[in-house]
Amino acid sequence: AASSTAAAASGSANVGVCIYQFADNFMTLYRTDLEEYLKDMGYSVTIMDGKNDQNTQTEQINTFLQQGVDVLIINPVQTTSAQTIVDTISPSGTPIVFINREPDKAVLDSYAGKCCYVGADARQSGTYQGELILETETQGDINGDGKITYIMCKGDPENIDAQYRTEYSIKALTDAGKEVECLYEYLDNWDQTTAQQDVANALSQYGDKIEVVFCNNDAMALGALQSIQQAGRTVGKDVYLVGVDALSEAVQNVVDGNMTGTVLNDDVGQATAAAAATKLYVEGSKVEQYYWVDYVKVTKENAAQYIK
């Protein structure tokens, strides 16, 4: 902690960043932004790739602690390991900024004043997905039988974002008084190829019954789109398709009418907030426990401005 005080006086700091996996599209955008903002503040930044393995990430955290970094920014491989991560770091007094994957509040409480979370509220992203469907011409009920029949492509089952998006996308429909029927929920673990295969199977099994394909992220939605097109279906005419992340390829598909919509997980807003929280820790200022960054609904009307 003494080093943090010295760092604050000189305005410089060493920041260690642990990303769950460099191969993740969204986290690549995020870490590029984050590195830029931290360096603009005059901090030296080291970013490590957890390679989607918690043991690897834990070793990286220990290395950063040995090096005496001033602040740790952590995008945990497993949110279920967040308490262990805090217990590893807390004896050193090093502040932690958790990003993008939300730990339980109890974890943040256990290291009060030295630990915060910067992210988007995944409930909102799910709600926005449901609203995208309610804003379509048929409100999701393409065949007019009085109910919205859908399939769901889900991310990592342990990930709170996946859980909330699955729940709140449908809650938006039922809150609007709609009757819904789930044909099947597929566990596609955020993966494009897995989703492509599952949606191909679903389309051959359920055919025209499928009115909406909900995907917890855009990678899975892009996989779903390939199978929808191969099956001779047309998004906007006989099926609706929504994702989350606003990846460039997905946004282009929204512009082209091949996806109903997506939800922007605002990497710029989140990276800005994470860098700001880091600066507060370096300066020894008061840090809030949560910093929430809004999602943005991306439709054909506004999509062009979100193409990166």
Which role does the model predict for each range below?
Residues 1-308:
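A residue-level marker of the well-folded mature domains of exported/periplasmic proteins
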